[in-house]
Amino acid sequence: MGPYLSQPKTEKTSVTGQNQVLQYAATHMQGWRNTMEDAHISDLNIEPDVHLFAVFDGHGGSEVAIFAERHFREELMKNKNYQQKNYEKALTETFFKIDKMLQEPSGLDELNKIRGVTDEASLAGCTANVALIVGKTLYVANAGDSRSFLNRDGKPFDMSKDHKPDDEQEKKRIERAGGFVSDGRVNGNLSLSRALGDLEYKKDNRFKPEEQIITALPDVKVTQLSAADKFLLMGCDGVFETWDHQQILNFINSELKNTQNLQKAAEKLLDQLLAKDTSLGTGCDNMTCILIQFK
């Protein structure tokens, strides 16, 4: 059996919410893939005027994405730097804390229970694109190739960059740690160079966590939100295979102008991006997006 179904699963699971400062719609669709491996967080007011959103795109199984979805908020809020309002450092430390938890017996046991087997959980991983909104400050921490961008005055303002093995700095780290890049893949296998999980690439005790073949180290980008910022779109890589950011932005603007409905706009976006068939390979992945509109 190949990676694709004979017909796509186009049913969507969506959640919405709003408060005084923003409203959001989060939606996901399995699409052509045999399994659904994405997970996400959409959490208003984890404390007053602090909001948390995240996209986790799993590979090799859904268990690491589900684990991150379950534990990220709690671990972030327990973090001392978070409590001291050092949010950039807190986000980075929480990425590494999730990775550490995955390697502990209790974490491995939870992965196995999610997966339903006892021998392959360490092969799974996930991207992590996490947005923390604190008042008018937006922090986006990213490891992997999920993305976030703002609609800033009608133009996309990227809040993350993809971590790909062919990138010069990524390739240097991979090779220093004893790995190699072949056909744009780490050790000929993984098409991204930073992720949560993927524990088999993180076993060399000679190297720090940020120096391993695959690292959970996120880039953290910070910006001040203003009236120029209309919405933030977050998504797994499947959302960004077909259209560029400007095309996606224009589509969402048009839909919101017509419907004023975030959920309908997000769901219709996924329908537009879904491939008609699997011949080209693009538009065939699981798709998850979170659309956050600022009031």
Swiss-Prot record:
Signal peptide: none
PROSITE patterns (UniProt xref): PPM_1 (PS01032), PPM_2 (PS51746)
InterPro entries the record matches: PP2C, PP2C_BS, PPM-type-like_dom_sf, PPM-type_phosphatase-like_dom
Free-text cofactor note: Binds 2 magnesium or manganese ions per subunit.
First-tier enzyme category under EC: hydrolase
Protein name: Probable protein phosphatase 2C 6
Family of this protein: Belongs to the PP2C family.
SUPFAM superfamilies xrefs: PP2C-like (SSF81606)
Coiled-coil regions, chain positions: none
Membrane topology label: Peripheral membrane protein
GO MF terms held by the record: metal ion binding; protein serine/threonine phosphatase activity
EC code(s) of this entry: 3.1.3.16
Record bears the keyword Cytoplasm: no
Organism of provenance: Paramecium tetraurelia
Database matches in PANTHER family: PROTEIN PHOSPHATASE 1G, PROTEIN PHOSPHATASE 2C
Compartments (UniProt record): Membrane
Catalyzed chemical reaction(s): O-phospho-L-seryl-[protein] + H2O = L-seryl-[protein] + phosphate; O-phospho-L-threonyl-[protein] + H2O = L-threonyl-[protein] + phosphate
GO biological process: signal transduction
Chain sites annotated for binding Mn(2+) 2: D57, D237, D285
Organism lineage: Eukaryota, Sar, Alveolata, Ciliophora, Intramacronucleata
Cofactor list: Mg(2+); Mn(2+)
Residues the entry annotates as binding Mn(2+) 1: D57, G58
Keywords assigned: Hydrolase, Magnesium, Manganese, Membrane, Metal-binding, Protein phosphatase
One GO CC term, this protein: membrane
Keyword Ribosomal protein listed: no
